[in-house]
UniProtKB/Swiss-Prot annotation:
PANTHER family: 50S/60S RIBOSOMAL PROTEIN L16, LARGE RIBOSOMAL SUBUNIT PROTEIN UL16M
One GO-annotated biological process of the protein: translation
Function: Binds 23S rRNA and is also seen to make contacts with the A and possibly P site tRNAs.
Region (Disordered): 1-24
Residue ranges, compositional bias (Basic residues): 1-17
Keywords: Ribonucleoprotein, Ribosomal protein, RNA-binding, rRNA-binding, tRNA-binding
Organism: Pelodictyon phaeoclathratiforme (strain DSM 5477 / BU-1)
PROSITE patterns: RIBOSOMAL_L16_1 (PS00586), RIBOSOMAL_L16_2 (PS00701)
InterPro entries linked to this entry: Ribosomal_uL16 (IPR047873), Ribosomal_uL16_bact-type (IPR000114), Ribosomal_uL16_CS (IPR020798), Ribosomal_uL16_dom (IPR016180), Ribosomal_uL16_sf (IPR036920)
Subunit structure: Part of the 50S ribosomal subunit.
Name of this protein: Large ribosomal subunit protein uL16
MF-aspect GO terms: rRNA binding; structural constituent of ribosome; tRNA binding
Keyword Nucleotide-binding set for record: no
Family, per entry: Belongs to the universal ribosomal protein uL16 family.
Lineage of origin: Bacteria, Pseudomonadati, Chlorobiota, Chlorobiia, Chlorobiales
Length: 139
């Protein structure tokens, strides 16, 4: 599972997901992409589940790029703990995804295969997504 090797601060504030994604909105590595339409926190487990679903369907043909990285720690207090006494300890890592962000890219497979692979990957994610084809793509 994806997570940073080391971080400057162990705990971060939650923050807000306002507006659209400013960067990472174009298909730049592969020919096909999976674009987020809604804002959400995508956990490292969800990213891994989507990656596995795509790789299995593509039967290890072609190449997959993961364009998001879970670099935000989410803290949680233990069950049945009274309020107060500080912030909980980091439990898992999330990637903050805003609308318009390209999350996955693929290349080296036919368009139909990529479409189905991304459809399977999208089922593993908690947001609505759209299949994107690079503008200069030729069959």
């Amino acid at each position: 599972m994806l997570m940073p090797k080391r971080v400057k601060y162990r705990k971060t504030q939650r923050g807000r997901m306002k507006g659209n994604s400013g960067r990472g909105t174009d298909v730049s590595f592969g020919s096909f992409g999976l674009k987020a339409i809604e804002p959400a926190w995508i956990t490292s487990r969800q990213i891994e589940a989507a990656r596995v679903a795509m790789t299995r369907f593509m039967k290890r043909d072609g190449k997959i790029w993961i364009r998001i990285f879970p670099d935000k720690p989410v803290t949680k207090k233990p069950a049945e703990t009274r309020m107060g006494s500080g912030k909980g300890s980091p439990e898992f890592w999330v990637a903050v995804v805003k609308p318009g962000r390209i999350m996955f890219e693929a290349d080296g497979v036919p368009k139909e295969v990529a479409t189905e692979a991304f459809r399977l990957a999208a089922k593993k994610l908690p947001i609505k997504t759209r299949f994107i084809v690079r503008p200069d793509y030729e069959d």
